[in-house]
Amino acid sequence: QKGELDERDEKLIKYLIRHRHTSTLEHNLVTFRFCVPLFVRSQHHRHRTWSYNEISRRYTNVDICFYEPVAFRTQHKSNRQASNTEELINPKPHFSDVGASSLVKAHHGRCLHLFNGLIDAGVCREQARGVLPQNMYTEYYGTVNLNNLLKFIDLRTHEGAQWEIQKLAEACLEIATDLWPITVNAYREIRSKK
C-alpha cells in the first residue's frame, strides 16, 4: 500500500477515464448534506444511482424557510427547458402594483400561516404540509459513488439545466475536486475535449 499517487497513477487514471473504464470510480463514496428548494430536490432525485434520506415534515418542527428570488429569469428563446440567465426581471403582474419577488414572499407567508393554522387546529402534519409551496427548502442526505457523481455533474452543469440545480452541481464539483483532485480534473479535461 502506498499513500500518495504518483505520475504513473495519474497516467493510469487518465487512461481509464479516456477509455471509459470507470468501474474503478464506483468504490469511492461521498455523502452530502443538501438544503435546497423542493423543486431542486425533485430534479436531483431523478438521479436514481444516489441513495437519499430526506428530513420529513411529518416528524419535525424544523423551521420552514423558502427560496425567495429577488429577480426572475426570462424564458429562453429556443430551449423550452431553459431560462435566460442574462436577462433578470422583477415584473409586476397585471393584477398587482408590486413586483413578483414581493408577491412570492407574501404568498410564502400566507402558505406558512395556513400550514401553522391547520396544525394548531389539529390537522396532522402529513396533510397540512400539502399547502406548502415548491419553493420551501428541504434537507436531505445524498450518497453516491464518484462515477455517478461525475455523470450528475456533467448533466446538471450543462447550460440547458435549470440554474438552481447548476449551482448545486457546481458545489458538488468543488467538493469532489477537493476529495479527488487528480481524478476529477482528468475527467473534466477529457470530457472538455469531446
Please name every model-derived segment.
Residues 1-194:
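Family-specific signature for flavin-dependent thymidylate synthase
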